[in-house]
Curated annotation (Swiss-Prot):
Residues 2-174 are annotated as: Pre-S. Residues 2-119 are annotated as: Pre-S1. Its main location: virion. It is found in: Virion membrane. Systematic vaccination of individuals at risk of exposure to the virus has been the main method of controlling the morbidity and mortality associated with hepatitis B. The first hepatitis B vaccine was manufactured by the purification and inactivation of HBsAg obtained from the plasma of chronic hepatitis B virus carriers. The vaccine is now produced by recombinant DNA techniques and expression of the S isoform in yeast cells. The pre-S region do not seem to induce strong enough antigenic response. The lineage of its organism: Viruses, Riboviria, Pararnavirae, Artverviricota, Revtraviricetes. The keyword S-adenosyl-L-methionine does not apply. This is Large envelope protein. Residues 2-253, 203-253, 370-375 are intravirion. Residues 1-51, 85-115 are annotated as: Disordered. GO terms for biological process: caveolin-mediated endocytosis of virus by host cell; fusion of virus membrane with host endosome membrane; virion attachment to host cell. Residues 120-174 are annotated as: Pre-S2. Glycans are attached at residue 320. Residues 2-181, 275-348, 399-400 are virion surface. It comes from Hepatitis B virus genotype B2 (isolate Vietnam/16091/1992) (HBV-B).
Length: 400
């Protein structure tokens, strides 16, 4: 019983041809997968068995405490299973043999605009226009809305769609134009924000200049503070709300804002008049009333042609309407001067003085230039707050 016998023994765990040292694996002859039957009752006599050549290799600890199967470790007899790492060199790729024969490299394809010109003309606009075409809609939506209907022949369909695709669609949008179109408004917003911050400093600068006129040669100090008020010494342009001079500061800045708005309004009126968009009619000697209106109501047309309304209609005593052209420039100033001369007769006395000043000698003009040079820095300090308004006036002059 204890010795080894070459004769296979039957029973559970007694087939020594199969590694079963622990003796708890069932006998293979009972397993239908190995085709055990009454004709082949023994595993060793089964012609369809797997001989397992590695079964005869006895590993370390096969029958000892390590419980290592005789055919090697739990992972097999390979060096990796035994814990030895070996580097297997990768096989080099096979040499190419199609250099001289076989498949040749694919040549470069011609541009799409040459091979498929209709694809360059197709976009979403022409696609929707094609769908709205009655001939195309008849292909998918027969008459009456039902599935029954007469479909055009295939050759007519192809010719119809080809004729529609041959139409030139809208040009493809250029990304450069889109980028430049977005960059322009961003630069305008940045410049506008910068000018706005500068314009907001104009009232404070003009307020400082206004208050400095009362403190020539000294530091402006608010006169509203007294011994009873617990207010520290401060500038009259930065009065707190509890200071008695606060209301005067607000009044000065309100007047300054009105002056700035009046200046902008005058510039806008002069600009509109320069563009011929301001129908100001000058007073004509001998005419009692004037009225503005289209030139087609006049019996005598105005001289010259213009795309802007450039004529005034007068009504003399005979009842006929006569049109006169509006001056292209300085009509507003001329109108104001004539209007003021009619109501204030003493302004006519200034005309000879202006004419005399214009006819002065060059020596007088040089003296005036010298005075401007001498008073230039002071004038610059006065006019410097208005410098941010110059770019705005320039943009209005160019784009209006």
């Amino acid at each position: 019983m204890g010795g080894w016998s070459s004769k296979p023994r039957k029973g559970m765990g007694t087939n020594l041809s199969v590694p079963n040292p622990l003796g708890f694996f069932p006998d293979h002859q009972l397993d239908p997968a190995f085709k055990a039957n009454s004709e082949n009752p023994d595993w060793d006599l089964n012609p369809h068995k797997d001989n397992w050549p590695d079964a005869n290799k006895v590993g370390v600890g096969a029958f000892g405490p390590g419980f290592t199967p005789p055919h090697g470790g739990l992972l097999g007899w390979s060096p990796q299973a035994q814990g030895l790492l070996t580097t297997v060199p990768a096989a080099p790729p096979p040499a190419s043999t199609n250099r001289q024969s076989g498949r040749q490299p694919t040549p470069l394809s011609p541009p799409l605009r040459d091979t498929h010109p209709q694809a360059m003309q197709w976009n979403s606009t022409t696609f929707h226009q094609t769908l709205q075409d009655p001939r195309v809609r008849a292909l998918y939506f027969p008459a009456g809305g039902s599935s029954s209907g007469t479909v055009s022949p295939a050759q007519n369909t192809v010719s119809t769609i080809s004729s529609i695709l041959s139409k030139t669609g809208d040009p493809v949008p250029n990304m450069e134009n889109i980028a430049s179109g977005l960059l322009g408004p961003l630069l305008v917003l940045q410049a506008g924000f910068f000018l706005l911050t500068k314009i907001l400093t104009i009232p404070q600068s003009l307020d400082s200049w206004w208050t400095s006129l009362n403190f020539l040669g000294g530091t402006p100090v608010c006169l509203g503070q007294n011994s009873q008020s617990q207010i520290s010494s401060h500038s009259p342009t930065c009065c707190p709300p509890i200071c008695p001079g606060y209301r005067w500061m607000c009044l000065r800045r309100f007047i300054i804002f009105l002056c700035i708005l009046l200046l902008c309004l005058i510039f806008l009126l002069v600009l509109l008049d320069y563009q011929g968009m301001l129908p100001v009619c000058p007073l004509i000697p001998g005419s009692s009333t004037t009225s503005t209106g289209p030139c087609k109501t006049c019996t005598t047309p105005a001289q010259g042609t213009s795309m802007f309304p450039s004529c005034c209609c007068t009504k003399p005593t005979d009842g006929n309407c006569t049109c006169i052209p509006i001056p292209s420039s300085w009509a507003f100033a001329k109108y104001l001067w004539e209007w003021a001369s009619v109501r204030f007769s003493w302004l006519s006395l200034l005309v000879p003085f202006v004419q005399w000043f214009v006819g002065l000698s060059p020596t007088v003009w040089l003296s005036v230039i010298w005075m401007m040079w001498f008073w230039g820095p002071s004038l610059y300090n006065i006019l410097s707050p208005f410098m941010p308004l110059l770019p705005i006036f320039f943009c209005l002059w160019v784009y209006i």
